[in-house]
Amino acid sequence: MGVCTIFRWLFAAYLLSSYKSLPGAYFVRFYYYVIQNLFLPMFTGFETENIKKLEKNEYGCFSYTSLDTYASPFECDFYFHKSNSTYFAELDISRGNLMCKIFQKLMLNSKHYPYIPVANVFTNFLKEIKPFQKYSVSSRIICWDEKWIYVMSRFTIKKGTVLCSLSLTKYVLKDGRKTIKPKDALEYCGLYNEKVAKISEDNLKLLTERCGFHETVPLENLSQEYCSEI
């Protein structure tokens, strides 16, 4: 085997290891969850297992999604760790899956798909993620108010024991130009009750009075005992 052949194989392996950075890869990864949660049920039935599971759980609105991946070479910067800018692509995928699942019933039964634009994002970078290092991204709703839904995402390594980054995202539910109140959306999905309302109220107070989009330590230690994976 010649040197050129070896080089070609090594280069091919390098490209394969960076599949997340290939043209179009982002759209494939993002729309995989959109198709899975919103388009396939059109053929398999609107009463999905996800909807049934959430409705049976009194804390269903606080369920989380988890994405397992790794830092590919093209995602790393000149400091030889995952570039800060690449965190947001993973956030799109993780949060997109979460919102499609939590509000799946609303979206499937609406005449027009409501959409959920991002209003604000804050990310606190705590520890580096090295090239080829495996990590997980988990996202869950932590609270809401009359208009906004607040989602917390955690980047962790070593099976969730080490927090590398924490992100807060502010969402709004829209039906055309009309804003859908989070409470109304959760009630429609069968996920609203007094217990989750109290948790949301406490977390919102923590977010606005002790944290905001600048200090995240109290949120890093936020209880997850009532959260389950979906």
UniProtKB/Swiss-Prot annotation:
One of its GO terms (molecular function) is transferase activity. It is an enzyme of class 2 (transferase). GO terms for cellular component: endoplasmic reticulum. It comes from the Eukaryota. Its EC number is 2.3.1.-. Keywords: Transferase. The keyword Methyltransferase does not apply. It holds the Pfam family 4HBT_2. Present with 1950 molecules/cell in log phase SD medium. PANTHER family: PROTEIN THEM6, PTHR12475. Belongs to the lcsJ thioesterase family. This is Probable thioesterase YBR096W. It comes from Saccharomyces cerevisiae (strain ATCC 204508 / S288c) (Baker's yeast).
